[in-house]
Amino acid sequence: MRKIDLCLSSEGSEVILATSSDEKHPPENIIDGNPETFWTTTGMFPQEFIICFHKHVRIERLVIQSYFVQTLKIEKSTSKEPVDFEQWIEKDLVHTEGQLQNEEIVAHDGSATYLRFIIVSAFDHFASVHSVSAEGTVVSNLSS
């Protein structure tokens, strides 16, 4: 089974919810595969977004590129709908002045149909997420 970036919109994933949206920096930018685009929060925390894979996947490694994110929680769900999320990963990120935070996480028990990313706190009034990539495999399609 080949490993792919499961989060890319070109692989069928989509951001189905985001707590803030700026028309110049919409949440879809997180998964568009373009390193020049990003999603920005609009102040106040926590902020969150949910990625839907539209299939059952097994994630082995996550890479999150962001700016000013301080504490990040990641929850996962294996339901057909975006419900029943369980706490999966919580990380305190290091502030990197003038450059992107590049957080790589080796994932354990990475079965999911949805991921919810919660930016609990930030180093500034605003934070941005430039990309989320999830290396792994497709387990099965969601049955209707």
UniProtKB/Swiss-Prot annotation:
Disulfide bonds: none annotated. One of its GO terms (cellular component) is intraciliary transport particle B. It comes from the Eukaryota. It comes from Homo sapiens. Its main location: other. This is Intraflagellar transport protein 25 homolog. Keywords: Calcium, Cell projection, Cilium, Differentiation, Metal-binding, Protein transport, Spermatogenesis, Stress response, Transport. GO terms for biological process: cell differentiation; cilium assembly; heart development; intraciliary anterograde transport; kidney development; left/right axis specification; lung development; protein transport.
